[in-house]
Design a protein with these regions (language model features):
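N-terminal nucleotide/polyanion-binding subdomain common to many enzyme families
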Residues: 1-86
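Short glycine-rich, flexible loops that bind phosphorylated cofactors or substrates
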Residues: 71, 162-164
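Proline-aspartate-enriched helix->loop->beta-strand connector
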Residues: 147, 151-161, 168
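Short active-site oxyanion
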Residues: 58-61, 102-104, 152-155
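A short, gly/pro- and small-residue-rich
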Residues: 53-58, 165-175
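Short amphipathic alpha-helical segments
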Residues: 48-49, 75, 117-118, 167-170
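Conserved beta-alpha
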Residues: 70-146, 150
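Short, well-ordered beta-to-alpha junction loops that form the rim of enzyme active sites
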Residues: 39-40, 108, 159-160
């Protein structure tokens, strides 16, 4: 898999289908894998937040999300496909459902996550959501312990910050 650099961070050059295939393989193993759909705001945050920067550097798959990332790469002579995080997440939900893999959702306002779950359950056959929590929490360790108990193979995170998952968690897709 080829990676290109932008502002000191490695970004994968897979197209949408290739990213889905790669992430699906990651989801099937028992190792922790973090997938980030990177946007311009994340580069800015990484300048002042070393933990955030390290998560970006250590992610197994970094997908260019946001026209700013695509343009930045194009300016440096690298033409890559922009992969919208929401489209990628939706496809990974479909893959998980087809393979009967448990998923977790973390983030958003309480009413938004509830509506999302209702919509997904209505639209996606065989969906197995084993855990959900809104993005308003102070006890990170409690959330991590709850996730470990549920053993999801895919965790979709929609927060203004990245979460660092230890070696007991599955694929975590963050955008």
């Amino acid at each position: 898999m080829k990676r290109v650099k932008l502002l000191g961070y490695e970004i994968d050059t897979l197209d949408f289908e290739g990213a889905v295939v790669y992430a699906t393989d990651l989801m099937r193993n028992d190792k922790v894998n973090q997938v980030v759909t990177i946007n311009p705001e994340m580069f800015d945050t990484a300048k002042t937040d070393i933990d955030f920067a390290n998560i970006l550097k250590e992610a197994e798959l970094v997908i260019p999300d946001g026209i700013g990332v695509k343009l930045g790469l194009k300016i440096t002579g690298k033409d890559v496909e922009r992969i919208a995080g929401v489209d990628f997440a939706r496809e990974m939900i479909n893959v998980a459902a087809k393979n009967n893999l448990p998923i977790a959702l973390v983030g958003a306002k309480p009413e938004i996550i509830e509506k999302t779950i209702n919509n997904l359950n209505a639209e996606v056959e065989n969906l197995n959501i084993v855990y959900s929590h809104d993005g308003y929490f102070n006890d990170f360790d409690e959330i991590m312990n709850q996730l470990k108990e549920c053993s999801p193979k895919l965790i979709l995170v929609a927060l203004g910050r990245l979460l660092s998952f230890d070696n007991h968690q599955p694929l975590a897709l963050q955008s």
